Design a protein with these regions (language model features):
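General structural signal for alpha-helix termini and helix-helix connectors
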Residues: 37, 60-63
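Hydrophobic membrane-insertion alpha-helices, especially the h-region
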Residues: 26-42
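Alpha-solenoid HEAT/Armadillo-like helical repeat scaffolds in large eukaryotic proteins
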Residues: 57-61, 92
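Alpha-helical transmembrane signal-anchor/signal-peptide segments
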Residues: 47-58
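Tandem repeat scaffolds
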Residues: 3-8, 13-22, 42-49, 65, ...
């Protein structure tokens, strides 16, 4: 077959074009790889922000002792109002620490060592504190804890004033000497809870489960105990209240007057007993007490040397 000059030229011209386009394609691929690698290198070398560092430090507390920078990290997160939803801090040691005013929705705190921890004004919606978490002398004032779980938690002498914890689970928790005054615990489960010497002054306990709960010497002044499950007359008769502010109960339960105290001296005695429960709750776990966010070790008293005994401070909030 004969090939004309024009056809030969076309074949010759196609060869360098193919080579040219291959080179262009290879160059573009190489440039793309360089750009991607440069971006990744820049991203990895970018300085860690204070907030990112703080979150990393807080998360590192899981199942171990807290790092030295913990307090500063929490403060930075709080100041930035950064939410820590779904954070897992199970087994962390938060003894005497300040975790107030944080957003910790659906947080997992199972088995934490939280004696004396402060969660005041924090959002703990659906948080998990079950499985024998240590929370003696802890504080949850003004916290939002709807549907949270505190089953089997030790909470002796804890403060839950003005707390909103509707449909929460406190089953089998220890709340001896705890203060739940002015809180809303509607529909929560308090079955088998030990409430001895606790304060439920003006507390909304409607529709709660109180089956087998210990209500010995519990102040239920002005508390709403209507439609509770498991509350019988024998249990109610163990409670006490101000004659001027009896609790609200559902029939056939009857209010039998039993005052928690009849003078200021008796009132002070009751407060001292509650504070003693709080101190015992701390001492049994810490062998000491909380003071300004730190654990203060307190050895046993020496009868022959009272000058060496360490006094436990009592603030106006305690009594």
């Amino acid at each position: 077959k004969r090939i004309t000059i024009n056809e030969a030229r076309k074949v010759v011209y196609k060869i360098p074009n193919k080579i040219f386009y291959k080179k262009i394609k290879s160059s573009l691929v190489a440039v793309s790889i360089i750009v991607i690698l440069s971006f990744l290198a820049f991203y990895n070398l970018k300085p860690e922000s204070l907030l990112e560092r703080s979150i990393r430090i807080l998360k590192s507390a899981k199942d171990t002792s807290i790092p030295p920078e913990f307090d500063e990290a929490v403060s930075a997160i709080r100041n930035n109002k950064f939410p820590l939803d779904n954070i897992d801090l199970s087994g962390a040691n938060f003894q005497c620490k300040d975790l107030s005013s944080l957003t910790l929705r659906r947080g997992i705190f199972i088995g934490i060592r939280g004696t004396g921890v402060n969660f005041d004004s924090s959002n703990l919606y659906l948080a998990q504190f079950g499985r024998f978490s240590e929370l003696n002398a802890s504080s949850f004032k003004n916290a939002l804890m709807d549907e949270s779980n505190f089953e089997n938690a030790n909470m002796i002498g804890s403060s839950l004033n003005n707390t909103i914890a509707r449909s929460a689970n406190f089953k089998n928790a220890t709340l001896n000497g705890a203060n739940l005054s002015n809180g809303d615990f509607t529909s929560s489960d308090f079955s088998k809870v030990n409430f001895t010497q606790a304060e439920l002054n003006s507390t909304n306990m409607r529709y709660t489960i109180l089956t087998e709960a210990n209500l010995q010497d519990v102040n239920v002044s002005n508390a709403d105990l209507r439609d509770t499950i498991g509350l019988d007359q024998k249990m109610l008769d163990k409670t006490c209240f101000s004659p001027k502010n009896p609790p609200i109960v559902s029939a056939p339960l009857i209010i039998n007057a039993r005052s928690c105290y009849n003078n200021e001296s008796k009132h002070k005695e009751r407060q001292i007993m509650q504070h003693a429960l709080k101190v015992v709750g701390m001492m049994s776990i810490l062998n000491g007490f909380c003071d300004k966010g730190k654990v203060i070790n307190r050895p046993p008293d020496i009868p022959s040397r009272p000058d060496l005994n360490i006094e436990i401070p009592i603030s106006s909030n305690d009594i």
